[in-house]
Amino acid sequence: MRKHMSTIIAILVFITGLSLLLYPTVSNYWNSLHQSRVVANYSDTMAKLSKQDKQAEIDRAVEYNSSLASNGGRFTLSESELSEYKSLLNADGTGMMGYITIPKIGVKLAIYHTVDESVLQVGVGHLEGSSLPVGGSGTHCVLSSHRGLPSAKLFTELDRMKKGDVFYLHVYDRVLAYQVDNIAIVEPNDYGLLEIEEGKDLCTLFTCTPYGINTHRLLVRGHRVENVMDEKNLTADAARVNPLVVASIIGLILYGIGYVVYRIKKRGV
């Protein structure tokens, strides 16, 4: 009886340890796979819209952005303003505006309205009150996501970005390229570097820093440049997982199962 009990305990310990070991890898893979599907669904929705409908939505967003420049308290929205904001660039009704690709760190993530916690857990949030991601002179789009989650990479490696690196916003039929020109660390409530600058087309990515402490905010700002790179087929993390990693995980699981079965048979003799 004691032998069987010790075997059961050994199995439970093994399974628990293996689960803890594999959770970050498996969870991040699952989230990346989900992101790939979300982006594919978004692309399908865009393909079904007429050019006229897509242009009409872009025009609405451009008009909205024009009204922000004169709104000093634009980062604090009333209920009616929030409702109007959420109705823009929302073709499929999910709140997805488009998606961002960052080749330097292998990121391809959906962009949603607001920076609510539920959004930042799974993708990239658009800071309400900042310019919508359609570009144009006198605009400043601000996007955010979490860093250091065990379940998803998201903006975990944003600190690897350097001046000169380029990231892309895919919104409706547009692919907007931004080249990093400024990197800063600020207090959580410091919006000074997020202001609209006359004549400039800017986009800032931000996340928490330092890693695991999260007392400040890392800002990575880019200015609009000509899109000369063919990066439309950037492979999402889920599709480019190293085969050696997958093989190692499968091998470890099979070895563990085989070892447990061997111990059970040996004790049963």
What are the language-model segments listed below?
Residues 1-2, 269:
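N-terminal Lys/Arg-rich, disordered targeting/topogenic segments
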Residues 3-244:
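Solvent-exposed, non-transmembrane regions of membrane-associated and secreted proteins
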Residues 233-269:
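C-terminal single-pass membrane-anchor helix
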